[in-house]
Amino acid sequence: MTAELLVNVTPSETRVAYIDGGILQEIHIEREARRGIVGNIYKGRVSRVLPGMQAAFVDIGLDKAAFLHASDIMPHTECVAGDEQKQFTVRDISELVRQGQDLMVQVVKDPLGTKGARLTTDITLPSRYLVFMPGASHVGVSQRIESESERERLKKVVAEYCDEQGGFIIRTAAEGVCEEDLASDAAYLKRVWTKVMERKKRPQTRYQMYGELALAQRVLRDFADAQLDRIRVDSRLTYESLLEFTAEYIPEMTSKLEHYSGHQPIFDLYDVENEIQRALERKVELKSGGYLIIDQTEAMTTVDINTGAFVGHRNLDDTIFNTNIEATQAIARQLRLRNLGGIIIIDFIDMNNEDHRRRVLHSLEQALSKDRVKTSINGFSPLGLVEMTRKRTRESVEHVLCNECPTCHGRGTVKTVETVCYEIMREIVRVHHAYDSDRFLVYASPAVAEALKGEESHALAEVEIFVGKQVKVQVEPLYNQEQFDVVMM
């Protein structure tokens, strides 16, 4: 199967789609006005310390102060208050930082909703093959490199470049890479870190000292270890920028870059626009006739599986099992496609067969193994729910593309026409008891006004008799279904 990246650029927005086997697997979106800040390094100032939460708020120049938990302050953290490194043994936040203290921090989670960015003092700088860890002294190897001999070879090579500046993590893409390329990567990361430290020493430097790559370059770097067949870009300027980037950092990718100039929009090649639209819907259809219902809330994401129209097996247990197996593949894809993170609760169709439960869990684990984002599955709970987590760093596709519904304010439901009609009648009675008026004028949405003049007209007539006043109904086209006004005349 072929795998490729499609890069679509429009003014102020860049989108990158990862296509595998002709199917959209991931979509990444970045807008100039809301560019993600994960990976950025800042010289911040502690604005508030909260011992009760074991956390501190840090001013890094954003609208909202960023959040730093005590567990994210690493033992090798450099306290800017005094430039010596301290080995912290006490985890009390009030003994780790103080209000007004300057601190070097890195963003690990973008601001989300009412929450500010989340920070760490465990700063890392990624490149194609390595991740540089300032202040560390060891070499780590990606768990996805399974060959023990290769792990030892890589550790031996990279260990030579560890010094007082820091240590390294060897990424999956480094498997089989020669010493020369690893040395080049290590030298590049150290140059970047040297520049960061030089900026930090300038008295006038506040806030950002290092910025992550732009979206197209960042995705290309992160997908460098994937078996990409080509990268198509519909912007000449971005294409030339990526040519320069790959020539310096990922030379073997340069030949795979193409400038797309076709008349058909680049995302129409694989029906990406419609796939994005479907990723915003609650319901996900399964080929068998079953379906998923995905609900994203601030606390967690829930996934409910239903057999729907699938009645393909005579044995009910087999029907349920096959639907759940199919659902595991769809769930893994939807988590990547929608970029859902945090706590995820999956409500599989109840299975009494323990072997079926074990095989469904295994299928889910296998499907999630393709995900580059860290996931953890806790298995079935006593209630039969599967609890798992997926590392959240950036906003979900829904949060990037959508706003809260102005009608329901995020509830997902609106009051029925009947409910609003009765609210209006109660409001008329309330106003009648509180104030003196000759008659009432009701402004309501078209649907509610029609109901008051139609099926609810008898009830409204009884209200008129009770208050002894005429009630006139007028349509207000701009009102949503829940909006109304009762005016005294």
Swiss-Prot record:
Q: Where in the cell is it found?
A: Cytoplasm
Q: List the disulfide bonds.
A: none
Q: Where is the S1 motif domain?
A: 39-128
Cofactor section:
Mg(2+)
- Quick one: a GO biological-process term for this protein? rRNA processing
A GO cellular component term found in this entry reads: cytoplasm
Record SUPFAM superfamilies: Nucleic acid-binding proteins
- Per UniProt, where does Mg(2+) bind? D304, D347
Q: Which GO terms of the molecular function aspect are on file?
A: endonuclease activity; metal ion binding; RNA nuclease activity; rRNA binding; tRNA binding
- Co-factor remark: Binds 1 Mg(2+) ion per subunit.
* Keyword annotations of the record: Cytoplasm, Endonuclease, Hydrolase, Magnesium, Metal-binding, Nuclease, RNA-binding, rRNA processing, rRNA-binding, tRNA processing, tRNA-binding
**EC identifiers of the protein:** 3.1.26.-
One Pfam assignment: RNase_E_G
Gene knockout outcome: No visible phenotype in rich media. Significant accumulation of a 16S rRNA precursor. Increased resistance to aminoglycoside antibiotics kanamycin and paramomycin. Increased lifetime of speF mRNA.
Q: Which Gene3D superfamilies match?
A: Nucleic acid-binding proteins (2.40.50.140), Ribonuclease E, catalytic domain (3.40.1260.20)
Q: What does this protein do?
A: Acts in the processing of the 5'-end of precursors of 16S rRNA. Confers adaptive resistance to aminoglycoside antibiotics through modulation of 16S rRNA processing. An endoribonuclease, it prefers 5'-monophosphorylated substrates and cleaves single-stranded sites rich in A and U residues; also contributes to 23S rRNA processing, tRNA processing and mRNA turnover. Involved in decay of speF mRNA, has a preference for adenine nucleotides.
The record's comment on protein family reads: Belongs to the RNase E/G family. RNase G subfamily.
Cite the record's note on assembly. Homodimer, and possible higher multimers.
Q: What is this protein called?
A: Ribonuclease G
* Species in which this protein is naturally found: Salmonella typhimurium (strain SL1344)
